[in-house]
Amino acid sequence: MLRHLPSRLPVKMWGRTLEKQSWRDSSQTPPPCLIRRLDHIVMTVKSIKDTTMFYSKILGMEVMTFKEDRKALCFGDQKFNLHEVGKEFEPKAAHPVPGSLDICLITEVPLEEMIQHLKACDVPIEEGPVPRTGAKGPIMSIYFRDPDRNLIEVSNYISS
């Protein structure tokens, strides 16, 4: 049987005692950021085979198999775990659908080379190169879509 805890249970964090508070309470000072980096994103896709082929051939991502027959696309210190629509693993997003992702990936390859590579692979560029703002400053970006119609932005940071 579950017992109801008092609504103002003290919590130890950051070397001090905090009172329990609702995340909706805008009068409270936000805590220091608790997140260091992104580890993985789950992509729901129509076809694992098409997705792994696209991301490995177009962006050079490594295809990894884990936990029996699950697939992931690895790059840098991150990965995309792949769920095939209708065969998702629990827990999962509330509404997992192919084509709902809009992501920005940073490359060190000059964008002009990326553009030539995409054209050679028959991947249409939807927009760009265009200036945008990245997490750490100004970037130059190109946009294209994967087989599920996810919007993929590939960018270079602009050095000042």
UniProtKB/Swiss-Prot annotation:
Cross-referenced Pfam families, in alphabetical order? Glyoxalase (PF00903)
What positions does the domain VOC occupy? 37-157
Which InterPro entries would you find in this protein's record?
Answer: Glyas_Bleomycin-R_OHBP_Dase, Glyas_Fos-R_dOase_dom, GlyoxalaseI/FosfomycinResist, VOC
Gene3D superfamilies named in the record: 2,3-Dihydroxybiphenyl 1,2-Dioxygenase, domain 1
| Family that this chain belongs to | Belongs to the glyoxalase I family.
Q: What is this protein called?
A: Glyoxalase domain-containing protein 5
Organism of origin: Homo sapiens (Human)
Q: Which gene encodes it?
A: GLOD5
